[in-house]
């Protein structure tokens, strides 16, 4: 960020060369103004002045002088490549370097800071769906590798579908499809090796059990031998409150669900087919980045083969009616810390709270919508003590996902996502769980724990008054030239970047804005401010996408991030961008300013 300029060239029609001035932008006006304000016009900023700036501008209370000195020393070490300093202060360029450093000046904190001593049901939990699949739901391979990847991305709930492999062995696969199986032992070892690599808070394994009592006994032995003292034993059917994440650190919890967890009747299945693709927000945010798993045409080739199997599965319904599927092996039953079942009597009865029992209920994304519309207060009351898991509808063959907001608004702890289903819905999920240090547990807002009879009164209407207003200024961006080839975006010129900025959350809060296009530059400066009034800031996510404008083709993707609004730090911050798969770019970031009013 030194303000240097040099010429860059692009080949045109093979024989012509177009030259562009490649400008490395200096500090933007907001940075210069902030520097002058706290140095009072001096050319250098002392650690004491930086301490005052961080305390007054950051909105996080008192910053210690030791922390300010650490930052000054680190900036000088990195920028000037020297171990000992003749001076201990920052120039304007040094200060700009600090503000643009994603690790020294991040937009959200990277430490666990929420109260972790409440019962487990008081938290949203990062949850995977069919965690063993490498791709689509119909024909992809099953493997232990996606499980390891999910756990290292912060997922705390892993799902395994257990099926007989012959008469004496057990495998993991997506039943009645063409997916290739993987050995259960490999999956268990993968969980053990990766469970607490990123977060020390508990991992829950949900088992979809299609086994005989003999094989249940074998599974119980495998689980016990693999995890040993890591296993947590608990009878959730005889308690009024579940332990806290803090109490369950580095513990593995086993939960079961019925082999078919659907509560829907045939009319719901018909509705599912008719709603395919309805939940997309492409009309507002533009086309979804290209599918990274399977195209629909690829899936159509295997769908017809699977439909007959799935239809037969639907007609048979839950294995609960089959005595061979009951939890008959006592060694297996003893492992179950969180019990799940399919209560009889319909949706209303399923949501009934038993004061002497804690359980987990699973609903499809469509059935959740029905439950919220008809029994919203009951859903919230149920989730204040019990666990509610939401899973993708059956037609998401390509492992796509749904918008998770309706689940969070209803207090559902486990919004089960296909972690290989890259796209905007998964970006939102990853954004939510960047909160609380990325530990995989996020404390639910107080209004979702309100025990009053009218527990759903909080749900915002179109005319809800904002509780808080977030001002966001997109100052500039940098780093693309280090992370991408010079011709990645345009073959004949530097890129033309613009930024989409918006809110995902309560319906009344959802909005999208965008900057103007900055043409022919690798270091675009937008200096565009947006204002977002928020009725439910506790569940709001700030969505940011960078695109490169193309006149005749689809705009190119240039990075994305989602940030929990409740975690955003005030002031000028360096915001790292991620690729379609949620992997952080090495250098690409935005300089943004945040203010709450």
Swiss-Prot record:
Q: Which residues form the EF-hand domain?
A: 26-60
Q: Which SUPFAM superfamilies match?
A: C2 domain (Calcium/lipid-binding domain, CaLB), EF-hand, PLC-like phosphodiesterases
Instruction: Please name the top-level EC class of this enzyme.
Output: hydrolase
Residue span(s) of domain C2: 449-579
**UniProt main location, coarse:** cytoplasm
Example GO biological process term? lipid catabolic process
Q: Which reaction does it catalyse?
A: a 1,2-diacyl-sn-glycero-3-phospho-(1D-myo-inositol-4,5-bisphosphate) + H2O = 1D-myo-inositol 1,4,5-trisphosphate + a 1,2-diacyl-sn-glycerol + H(+)
User: Which part of the chain is the PI-PLC Y-box domain?
Assistant: 333-449
Q: Which residues form the active site?
A: 129, 174
Source lineage? Eukaryota, Viridiplantae, Streptophyta, Embryophyta, Tracheophyta
Tell me the membrane topology, using the record's own terms.
Answer: Peripheral membrane protein
Chain intervals with Polar residues compositional bias:
293-309
Q: Which GO terms describe its molecular function?
A: phosphatidylinositol-4,5-bisphosphate phospholipase C activity
Domain named PI-PLC X-box: which ranges?
114-257
The cofactor required is: Ca(2+)
**EC number annotated for this UniProt entry:** 3.1.4.11
Q: Which gene encodes it?
A: PLC4
InterPro entries with a match to the protein in the record: C2_dom, C2_domain_sf, EF-hand-dom_pair, PI-PLC_fam, PLC-like_Pdiesterase_TIM-brl, PLC_EF-hand-like, PLipase_C_PInositol-sp_X_dom, PLipase_C_Pinositol-sp_Y
User: Per its record, how is this protein called by name?
Assistant: Phosphoinositide phospholipase C 4
Q: Where is the composition biased (Basic and acidic residues)?
A: 259-290
- Function recorded in the entry: The production of the second messenger molecules diacylglycerol (DAG) and inositol 1,4,5-trisphosphate (IP3) is mediated by activated phosphatidylinositol-specific phospholipase C enzymes.
Alphabetized UniProt keyword annotations? Cell membrane, Cytoplasm, Hydrolase, Lipid degradation, Lipid metabolism, Membrane, Transducer
């Amino acid at each position: 960020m030194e303000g240097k300029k040099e010429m860059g060239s692009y080949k045109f029609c093979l024989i012509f060369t177009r030259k562009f001035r490649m400008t490395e932008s200096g500090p933007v006006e907001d940075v210069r103004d902030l520097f002058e304000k706290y140095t009072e016009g001096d050319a250098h900023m002392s650690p004491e002045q930086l301490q005052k700036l961080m305390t007054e501008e950051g909105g996080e209370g008192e910053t210690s002088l030791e922390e300010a000195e650490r930052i000054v020393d680190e900036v000088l070490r990195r920028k000037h490549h020297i171990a000992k300093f003749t001076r201990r202060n920052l120039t304007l360029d040094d200060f700009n370097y600090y503000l643009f450093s994603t690790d020294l000046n991040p937009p959200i904190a990277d430490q666990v800071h929420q109260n972790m001593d409440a019962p487990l049901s008081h938290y949203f939990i990062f949850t995977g769906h069919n965690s063993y699949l490498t791709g689509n739901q119909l024909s992809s391979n099953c493997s232990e590798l996606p499980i390891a990847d999910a756990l290292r991305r912060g997922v705390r709930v892993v799902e395994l579908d257990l099926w007989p492999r012959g008469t004496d062995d057990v495998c993991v696969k997506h039943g009645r499809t063409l997916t290739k199986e993987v050995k259960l032992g490999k999956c268990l070892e993968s969980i053990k090796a990766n469970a607490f690599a990123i977060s020390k808070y508990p991992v829950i394994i949900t088992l979809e059990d299609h086994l005989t009592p003999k094989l249940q006994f074998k599974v119980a032995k495998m689980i016990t031998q693999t995890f040993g003292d890591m296993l947590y034993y608990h009878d959730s059917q005889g308690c009024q409150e579940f332990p806290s994440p803090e109490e369950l650190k580095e513990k593995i919890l086993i939960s079961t669900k019925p082999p078919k967890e659907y509560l829907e009747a045939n009319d719901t299945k018909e509705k599912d087919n008719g709603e395919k693709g309805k939940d997309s927000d492409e009309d507002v945010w533009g086309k979804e980045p290209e599918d990274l798993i399977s195209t629909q045409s690829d899936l159509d080739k295997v769908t017809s083969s699977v439909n007959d199997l799935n239809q037969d599965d639907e007609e048979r319904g839950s294995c609960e009616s089959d005595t061979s599927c009951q939890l008959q092996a006592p060694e297996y039953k003893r492992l179950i810390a969180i019990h799940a079942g399919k209560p009889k009597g319909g949706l209303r009865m399923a949501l009934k709270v038993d004061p002497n029992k804690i359980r987990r209920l699973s609903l499809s994304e469509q059935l959740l919508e029905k439950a919220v519309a008809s029994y919203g207060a009951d859903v919230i009351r149920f989730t204040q003590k019990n666990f509610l898991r939401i899973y993708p509808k059956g037609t998401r063959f390509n492992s796509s996902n749904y918008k998770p907001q309706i689940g969070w608004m209803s207090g559902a702890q486990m919004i089960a996502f296909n972690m290989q289903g890259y796209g905007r819905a998964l970006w939102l999920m990853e954004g939510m769980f960047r909160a609380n240090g990325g530990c995989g547990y996020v404390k639910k807002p107080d209004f979702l724990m309100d025990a009053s009879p009218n527990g759903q009164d909080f749900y915002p209407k179109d005319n809800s008054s904002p509780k808080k207003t977030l001002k966001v200024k997109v100052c500039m961006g940098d780093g693309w030239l280090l992370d991408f080839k010079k011709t990645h975006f345009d073959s004949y010129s530097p890129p033309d970047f613009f930024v989409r900025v918006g809110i995902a959350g309560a319906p009344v809060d959802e909005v999208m804005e965008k900057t103007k296009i900055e043409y022919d530059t690798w270091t675009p400066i937008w200096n565009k401010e947006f204002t977002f009034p928020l009725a439910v800031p506790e569940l709001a996510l700030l969505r940011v996408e960078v695109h490169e404008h193309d006149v005749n083709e689809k705009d190119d993707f240039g990075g994305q991030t989602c940030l929990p609004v409740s975690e955003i730090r005030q002031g000028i911050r360096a915001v790292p961008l991620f690729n379609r798969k949620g992997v952080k770019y090495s250098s690409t970031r935005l300089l943004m300013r945040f203010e709450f009013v």
